[in-house]
């Protein structure tokens, strides 16, 4: 690394508006030779008020800056610290622009010669990290960060992560390092200087035996599984007792009972539905049952979970714990569809692609660092999003495998006979059709969080025509001979002429004209769809922020689709008999696009359920046409029920009105299921109150202002007494934002952080909610699925409305043909399940103090109130006005304070 010196900078500011906000803290950590060589830190005085959100985030209050210097008083000192060093920051634009502006105000022209963005660096060095927020990076890489969002600690943490990334790069094989260097020239900042020094100083040594080489790619070799050596002389009860004792867990008869039930289904090839309450230890129960079954019969067991989080918990925590307890080595692995695994030939093609787009360039570098450490080749590890995902998906679709290709899915197939427990998720389980031979090796399956299975099945029964996706796919072909694949074809024809290649002549002009016409026909199709939307009744479910048209005439759409499909077919005829790789790639891309149009055309001809979606009513680019091709019941029957001899469905919420009938309705009628309800380990919810306000009028759209004002009154009463956090759940964004506006206007909430749910930001918001003491989280009904609600005092959830899906929710429309009464058979059970899930996850143990406030009096006064009674029967229920609510909260708070 030579003698390069780095200044790793972190700033805290009063906000993110460069023209208005000011720096309130600076932290600098100096790095030389991969070691921290010093630090600099100062609070900075400002005449601006520090907003409550910034105070909560940074723990910096106005009083802490009273004795601090203004920036101009220490500007020269800071400038001297920075001027001859590489300027480094995490998301460097923010810090660099703020400090440049601060220097500019002091008549100092600060222009660092070299700049490094650790956000860019960490994406390349740590390609599988779920998040590149500093606090999460620190946690993932075991670097202490006690006070996130304090400049001094953040700067040091960033520096330590940077050093770790540098050290990782220095250990890479020289061929990988060189490729990273060449690619880094297309980055925004100066990482290429760092990599150049590493290449220059790299010791040339033979390639380590743990690595292999495919063309120019260095990859980590896979180690085949060994035959399992797991044996146990004793019963399942003995196995359970030994594991519980060894791991110092509580012996729970209900947990053993659950495990015994599951083993019985496996041994007798039965199909069962089991309701086991949250907190009953389901994971350990079914893992031990699967292990015992494998020991006694030698047969594999598939376990399907709802989330990647639970998959990782099973593979990285629960199974290793059992191995430790029994001194075993259980062969358990993740099972997915073939398309979810990488091939080295695909990576090679991506690296050879001349695309210099910034995100694609980052992806190329990520692939190089990932493939040298992955043992599975699981594409999902890369957490691809946005443009990267679109690009990658297109490359998969158009990839023509080379003969000597190495596909990571073959490792799973090769080792399948040694796998004892396969772990998958609901989406892959349902998506896995006949092409996934690996699933056919499993005769027995346990499905956890089974209540979510129909949602995943619903995702598999639709096809869509997406304007933005089709525009992107057609764009990859190009519109003239100077663009994308058309450019490659034109180049091939020039080579044929100049080098006399032994291939048939290509009608480049005719091809270009056809492709141009396909572009125009696509625009015409979506112009017609846009016109239909503008002239139709448009509905909004107020959750997904999309607009929908459910009833429309598809005559013109079918005519347009026919013209496009016909034109693509005629274009494909140009390539008849041609086998060159470039032509194969273009042909495959055209076939992919053609299939998209053709499938929708056939579905509309067959009068399948369909609807139009548009995210922005003024933008054609946000249009989708969605059609339903299969019944959810058929998908669940053929892809789940008929696939396994033994099948066990487990969830904390499988019953509706104390019966399994609603869940049974998802499958064909002639199947017998054994049904079990495991008693809860929490005998009652004595510490939890359900409160129904009597002074809030029943909701209707005419009284929404009064309804919202009542919700805010109760929130205000609660926080005034407890001085603590609160979660408020809504079924519409409109009502949520109305409450937010009122909260922001009231002085009571000046020192509170009001968080509102944003799409794709749930994880981040939950983290903030759990980290802050004085915060209010406003979320939609997606939070009814629950999360790890952390609170020092009362866990309070206020429910604006029960979690019924909006009547304009697309699920409602798609499922209407599958039930005699969509409300009674689908919507109501779904609402009750969501309600039960939310409450069940709120109260996790006997010590939790819970308060649930339901403003929706349908909970106790509607025709279907009895269906919610199953959820509430173990809770204390109270009804009263806001004064009685105040007394109840005071009483609960007094009890908590007395027990401290």
Swiss-Prot record:
SMART domains: EXOIII, HELICc2. GO terms for molecular function: 3'-5' exonuclease activity; ATP binding; DNA binding; DNA-directed DNA polymerase activity; helicase activity; hydrolase activity, acting on acid anhydrides, in phosphorus-containing anhydrides. It is an enzyme of class 3 (hydrolase). GO terms for cellular component: cytosol. CDD domains: DEDDh. InterPro entries: ATP-dep_Helicase_C (IPR006555), DinG (IPR006310), DnaQ (IPR006054), Exonuclease_RNaseT/DNA_pol3 (IPR013520), Helic_SF1/SF2_ATP-bd_DinG/Rad3 (IPR014013), Helicase/UvrB_N (IPR006935), P-loop_NTPase (IPR027417), RNaseH-like_sf (IPR012337). Its EC number is 3.1.-.-. Gene3D superfamilies: P-loop containing nucleotide triphosphate hydrolases, Ribonuclease H-like superfamily/Ribonuclease H. This is 3'-5' exonuclease DinG. It comes from Staphylococcus haemolyticus (strain JCSC1435).
């Amino acid at each position: 690394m030579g003698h390069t010196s780095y200044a790793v900078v972190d700033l805290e500011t009063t906000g993110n508006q460069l023209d208005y906000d000011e720096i309130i803290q600076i932290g600098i950590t100096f790095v030389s030779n991969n070691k921290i060589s010093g630090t600099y830190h100062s609070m900075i005085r400002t005449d601006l008020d520090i907003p409550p959100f910034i105070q909560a985030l940074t723990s910096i209050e106005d009083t802490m800056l009273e004795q601090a210097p203004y920036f101009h008083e220490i500007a020269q000192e800071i400038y001297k610290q920075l001027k001859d060093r590489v300027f480094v920051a995490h998301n460097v634009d923010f810090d660099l622009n703020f400090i440049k502006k601060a220097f500019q105000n002091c008549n100092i022209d600060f222009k660092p010669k070299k700049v490094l963005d650790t956000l860019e660096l960490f994406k390349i060095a740590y390609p599988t990290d779920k998040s590149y927020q500093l606090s999460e990076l620190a946690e993932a890489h075991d670097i202490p960060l006690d006070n996130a969002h304090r400049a001094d600690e953040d700067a040091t943490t960033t520096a330590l992560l940077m050093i770790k990334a540098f050290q990782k790069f220095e250990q890479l094989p020289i061929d990988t390092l060189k490729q990273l260097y060449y690619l880094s020239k297309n980055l925004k900042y100066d990482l290429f200087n760092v990599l150049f020094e590493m290449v220059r100083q790299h010791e040339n040594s033979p390639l380590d035996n743990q690595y292999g080489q495919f063309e120019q790619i260095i990859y980590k070799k896979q180690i085949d599984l060994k035959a399992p050596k797991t044996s146990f002389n004793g019963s399942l009860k003995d196995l359970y007792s030994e594991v519980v004792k060894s791991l110092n867990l509580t012996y729970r008869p209900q947990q053993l009972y659950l495990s015994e039930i599951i083993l019985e289904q496996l041994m007798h090839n039965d199909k069962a539905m089991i309701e086991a309450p949250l907190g009953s230890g389901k994971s350990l129960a079914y893992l031990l049952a699967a292990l015992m079954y494998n020991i006694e019969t030698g047969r594999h067991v598939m376990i399907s979970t709802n989330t990647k989080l639970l998959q990782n918990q099973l593979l990285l925590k629960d199974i290793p714990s059992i191995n430790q307890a029994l001194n075993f080595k259980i062969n358990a692995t993740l099972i997915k569809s073939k398309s979810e695994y990488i091939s080295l030939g695909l990576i090679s093609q991506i690296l050879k692609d001349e695309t210099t787009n910034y995100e694609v360039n980052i992806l190329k570098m990520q692939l190089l660092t990932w493939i040298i450490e992955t043992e599975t080749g699981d594409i999902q590890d890369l957490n691809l999003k946005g443009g990267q995902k679109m690009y990658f998906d297109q490359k998969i679709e158009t990839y023509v495998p080379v003969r000597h290709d190495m596909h990571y899915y073959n490792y799973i197939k090769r080792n399948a006979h040694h796998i004892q427990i396969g772990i998958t998720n609901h989406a892959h389980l349902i998506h896995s059709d006949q092409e996934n031979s690996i699933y056919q090796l499993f005769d027995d399956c346990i499905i956890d969080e089974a209540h979510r299975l129909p949602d995943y099945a619903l995702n598999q029964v639709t096809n869509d025509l997406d304007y933005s996706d089709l525009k992107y796919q057609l764009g990859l072909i190009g519109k003239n001979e100077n663009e994308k694949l058309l450019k490659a074809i034109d180049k091939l024809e020039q080579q044929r002429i100049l080098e006399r290649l032994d291939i048939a002549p290509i009608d480049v002009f005719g091809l270009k004209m056809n492709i141009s016409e396909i572009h125009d026909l696509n625009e015409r199709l979506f112009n017609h769809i846009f016109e239909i939307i503008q002239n139709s009744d448009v509905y909004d479910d107020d959750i997904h922020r999309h607009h929908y048209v459910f009833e429309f005439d598809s005559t013109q759409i079918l005519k347009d689709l026919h013209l496009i499909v016909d034109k693509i077919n005629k274009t494909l005829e140009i390539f008849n008999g041609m086998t060159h790789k470039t032509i194969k790639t273009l042909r495959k891309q055209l076939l992919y696009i053609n299939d998209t149009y053709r499938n929708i055309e056939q579905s509309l001809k067959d009068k399948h359920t369909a609807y139009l979606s548009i995210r922005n009513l003024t933008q054609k680019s946000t249009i989708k046409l969605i059609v339903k091709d299969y019944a959810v019941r058929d998908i669940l029957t053929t892809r789940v029920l008929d696939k396994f001899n033994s099948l066990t469905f487990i969830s904390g919420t499988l019953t509706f009105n104390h019966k399994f009938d609603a869940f049974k309705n998802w499958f064909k009628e002639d199947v017998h299921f054994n049904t079990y309800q495991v008693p809860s380990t929490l005998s009652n919810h004595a510490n939890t109150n359900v409160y129904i306000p009597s002074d809030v009028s029943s909701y209707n759209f005419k009284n929404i202002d009064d309804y919202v004002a009542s919700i805010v009154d109760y929130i205000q009463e609660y926080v005034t007494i407890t001085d603590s956090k609160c979660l408020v759940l809504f079924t519409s964004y409109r009502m949520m934002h109305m409450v937010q506006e009122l909260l922001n206007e009231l002085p009571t909430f000046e020192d509170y952080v009001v968080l509102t749910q944003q799409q794709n930001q749930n994880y981040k918001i939950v983290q903030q909610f759990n980290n802050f003491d004085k915060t209010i989280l406003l979320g939609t009904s997606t939070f009814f699925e629950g999360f790890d609600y952390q609170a020092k005092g009362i866990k309070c959830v206020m429910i604006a409305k029960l979690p019924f899906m909006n009547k304009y929710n697309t699920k409602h429309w798609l499922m209407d043909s599958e039930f005699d009464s969509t409300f009674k058979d689908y919507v109501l059970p779904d609402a009750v399940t969501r309600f039960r899930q939310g409450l069940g996850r709120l109260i996790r143990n006997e010590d939790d103090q819970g308060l649930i406030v339901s403003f929706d009096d349908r909970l106790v006064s509607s025709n279907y109130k009895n269906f919610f009674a199953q959820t509430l029967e173990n809770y204390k229920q109270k009804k009263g006005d806001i004064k009685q609510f105040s007394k109840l909260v005071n009483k609960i708070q007094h009890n908590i304070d007395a027990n401290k």
